Curated annotation (Swiss-Prot):
It is found in: Secreted. Expressed in the pituitary, testis, and heart and at lower levels in the brain. It comes from Homo sapiens (Human). The active form requires C-terminal amidation and disulfide bond formation. Residues 114-181 form a propeptide. The modification Leucine amide is found at residue 113. This is Protein FAM237A. May be capable of activating GPR83 via the GNAQ signaling pathway. Residues 1-33 form the signal peptide. It comes from the Eukaryota. One of its GO terms (cellular component) is extracellular region. Keywords: Amidation, Secreted, Signal. The keyword Nucleus does not apply.
């Protein structure tokens, strides 16, 4: 029979058990993480949101870098691979803004809040909806538009700050480099 005054005997198995539990969680958790999806994988990306977010960011850029989405992404790749620190800073700022726009698009589509472009179906749906539902949706879409306009102003301000800091020659050099490739 164990001596009631000897508490070390009880303490050791508990600390050993806790240690095993912690080590087990650290070793087992990576196996569970493999089932999670990588949000940055292009095969998992929502192509409509990717395209619309790219177009939106491209339209906000003044002066215009490219007329196509692929040209815009060529420009982004150039900025990322450039060794100029200002190019890298501009890339990360634009990437963050793109990601914010993209995530907003994906979330709104997944939750049914995004605009659906269904020809003919839109009239049927709006006719079947009660009046109070339509007014709530109008308020929400107005909030989305306000949020979008604020983001657009933020992006334009950010881009103009980068252009002023580095001079417009940076944009010209970047455009020349892209055209050469």
């Amino acid at each position: 029979m164990a001596d009631p005054g000897n508490r070390g005997g009880i303490h050791r198995p508990l600390s050993f058990t806790c240690s095993l539990l912690i080590v087990g969680m650290c070793c087992v958790s990576p196996f569970f993480c493999h089932s999670q999806t990588d949000l940055l994988a292009l095969s998992q990306a929502d192509p409509q949101c990717w395209e619309s977010s790219s177009v939106l960011l491209l339209e906000m850029w003044k002066p215009r870098v490219s007329n196509t989405v692929s040209g815009f992404w060529d420009f982004m790749i150039y900025l990322k691979s450039s060794e100029n620190l200002k190019h890298g800073a501009l890339f990360w700022d634009l990437a963050q803004l793109f990601w914010d726009i993209y995530v907003d698009c994906v979330l709104s589509r997944n939750h049914g809040l995004g605009r659906r472009q269904l020809v003919g179906e839109e009239e049927k749906i709006s006719a079947a909806q009660p009046q109070h539902t339509r007014s709530k949706q109008g308020t929400y879409s107005q909030l989305l538009r306000t949020s979008f306009l604020k983001k657009k102003e933020l992006i334009e301000d950010l881009i103009s700050m980068h252009v002023r800091r580095s001079g417009s020659s940076v944009i010209g050099k970047v455009n020349l480099e892209i055209k050469r490739k």
